[in-house]
Amino acid sequence: MTLYISDILSSNPVITTGTDVNNKSSLDMIAKSLNGHIDDFRDKVLKINSRIVNNEKVGLYIDGDYKVDTRGFEVLSKDDNLINSMDEVVIISNRNTLEEDLNRKLKDKEIIKVTPKDIVIGIGCKRNTECEHMKNSLIDFLSKQNIDINAVKEIGSIDVKKDEEAIINLSKYLNVPFKIFTPEEISKVDYLYDKSEWVKKNVGVYSVAEPVAHLLSNGNLIVQKHKYNGITFSVGRINI
């Protein structure tokens, strides 16, 4: 309707929300700034934004160094007694579970989780790896590393794997891009990690998973390589 009226008047439409008008942040603004995932996005956004506009208390716990607009929210720390006075708490985290003491405090609260997409995964694997094995191995790997699968932003491998069905299928399952790197690109950083003459002989570089995670994250590797019966994963984190 706003666009329709602006067309009649030959003017530029300005669409505002209640949080804009009240000079406050909003759940959707926070999620957008983090490229974040929220389950039941629309319903959660409408509910939380309505509370913010009506000056009701909504807690915000930031698990990490994420920089977001916190206006209108009650920013909490894990040792904060304010948690007890909150009915609803928005949590920003790329982890599956938080510290045990914090979980206890949040036990009876309604939790709205924003999962920033800041995790990248380097993958090496044997040719013709089964798709289910690849998917199940990654799910298990992320669970053991306490990483939320919704935090994955991108996966990558060496260019000889560009047609590897298991990795292509994984990117579709995760709904994230699959980026490939040439041996020349990988060789610029593979000296930083464990070397395998067998890998060098077969694909032209000394290793794949760690250098690819390094390249995807601009050098911010957070989990070294882990092997799963013909598959190797490594994790990097990008700065948002």
Functional labels for PLM-detected ranges:
Residues 41-45:
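Long lumenal/extracellular ectodomains of secretory and single-pass membrane proteins
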Residues 1-37, 48-162, 166, 236-238:
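Conserved mixed alpha/beta catalytic, RNA-binding, or beta-rich assembly cores of soluble enzyme
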Residues 34, 38, 190-193:
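Solvent-exposed, flexible loop/coil residues
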Residues 133-140, 150-213, 217-233, 240:
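C-terminal non-catalytic interaction/assembly regions of soluble proteins
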